Amino acid sequence: MKSSSVAPRLKQERQDDCKFQEGDVNSLELRLGISSDNDQISGGGAASPWLGVGVHPWSLAARQGKAALEQAHQRPNECAVQRENRAASSAQLVGWPPVRAFRKNLSTPKPADADDLMNKVKLCSDEGHGSRCAAQERRSSSTMFVKVNLEGYAVGRKIDLKAHRSYDSLSQALQSMFHGFLSDGIATRDNELQQMEEGSKKRYVLVYEDNEGDRMLVGDVPWELFIASVKRLYIAQDPRVHAKLR
């Protein structure tokens, strides 16, 4: 009788030990929820660790990680922004020691007549022989001396065309310059011409050479155009005098 009563008692003690060990393991279990001392509910069963929170911790952590990734993508990379700013600032530095680009432009002023010079060079290349360039240079200068040659004489003179404003003024100046040459007292090689003139003054015409190398009669074009194209003056004898000799 004693042995039959001892066996159920040992079996009951073993079951109690197993339940006690399971309770210790549950108390030491790691939990992601909010900790609570009331882990046991009435009825002797272990309460679920998620009942006090109401949200599964793994889903909450997933949402938090997703939000952090979205913020990281939307936020600009500070290192990249710093590198771009540093590259932009270094690109604006010129020379050594570093000088800002706009300050370097101020320190090296552009010549005022650079555009005019480029226009003159372009005109010279377009014309080929540079006639228009020479004409522009003569207009811009304050003086314009050209050679004057009298037909039949090897020695010539020079006259400043800028000192005159009309053909009349130029004609009077040439007459005063060549007064001795144009008078009857000068000996010439053409004795027959002197006899036909019978002491009267010889008749001369004023001719000029233009920028194309042609000889033209003075007075056909306006004075400004004449100044722009003349290169040399010639005082030639009137061809009508030679016609009379024939």
Swiss-Prot record:
Task performed by this protein: Aux/IAA proteins are short-lived transcriptional factors that function as repressors of early auxin response genes at low auxin concentrations.
Tagged with keyword 4Fe-4S: no
Name listed for the protein in its UniProt record: Auxin-responsive protein IAA25
Any single biological process term in GO: auxin-activated signaling pathway
Organism of derivation: Oryza sativa subsp. japonica
Tissue-level expression: Highly expressed in flowers. Expressed in roots and seedlings.
Stretches assigned to the PB1 domain: 143-238
Subcellular location: Nucleus
Quaternary structure and interacting proteins, as annotated: Homodimers and heterodimers.
